[in-house]
Swiss-Prot record:
Keywords: Ribonucleoprotein, Ribosomal protein. It comes from Kluyveromyces lactis (strain ATCC 8585 / CBS 2359 / DSM 70799 / NBRC 1267 / NRRL Y-1140 / WM37) (Yeast). Residues 94-155 are annotated as: Disordered. GO terms for cellular component: cytosolic large ribosomal subunit. PANTHER family: 60S RIBOSOMAL PROTEIN L24, RIBOSOMAL PROTEIN L24. Residues 94-129 have a biased composition (Basic and acidic residues). InterPro entries: L24e/L24_sf, Ribosomal_eL24, Ribosomal_eL24-rel_N, Ribosomal_eL24_CS. It holds the Pfam family Ribosomal_L24e. This is Large ribosomal subunit protein eL24. The gene is RPL24. GO terms for biological process: cytoplasmic translation. One of its GO terms (molecular function) is structural constituent of ribosome.
């Protein structure tokens, strides 16, 4: 025994029951009752009609006991070695006291400042040597003399 399903309401249609509606594009619609056929022809939305299967599915009626709550897995953080830092080194750095870490940071900053200062001084001395070797550069415009603006004769 083949049981069909109503195209509008989703109800079961047993053999010998219901009607068929064939649309112009040859799509077949089966209706269990004239009520569902009428509502279909009025272009009603079955999701908005309370007694249809689609309405019940859309508004989550009568399926609460079937669906079990999905369990979410909690992520666990794990320490891993990174390129350029082994796991032991990372653990050692983490275990340092904040005061010690601050002192190390200040020391590193000071060393970097000194290095930057030394680099700057070296570059400056090198630039001075080059300037002394070449002599002073004078552009053609400077050699000609500054442009003299003509004084206006009218008042």
């Amino acid at each position: 025994m083949k049981v069909e399903i109503d195209s509008f309401s989703g109800a079961k249609i047993y053999p010998g029951r219901g009607t068929l509606f064939v649309r112009g594009d040859s799509k077949i619609f089966r209706f269990q009752s004239s009520k569902s056929a009428s509502l279909f022809h009025q272009r009603k939305n079955p999701r908005r009609i309370a007694w249809t299967v689609l309405y019940r599915r859309h508004h989550k009626k009568g399926i609460t006991e079937e669906v079990a709550r999905k369990r979410t897995r909690k992520s666990v953080k794990a320490q891993r070695a990174v390129v350029g830092a082994s796991l032991e080194l990372i653990k050692e750095r983490r275990s340092l006291k904040p005061e010690v870490r601050k002192a190390q940071r200040d020391e590193k900053k000071k060393a970097d400042k000194e290095k930057k200062k030394a680099d700057k001084a070296a570059r400056k001395s090198e630039k001075a040597k080059l300037a002394a070797a070449q002599g002073s550069k004078v552009s053609k415009q400077q050699a000609k003399g500054a442009f003299q603006k003509v004084a206006a004769t009218s008042r």
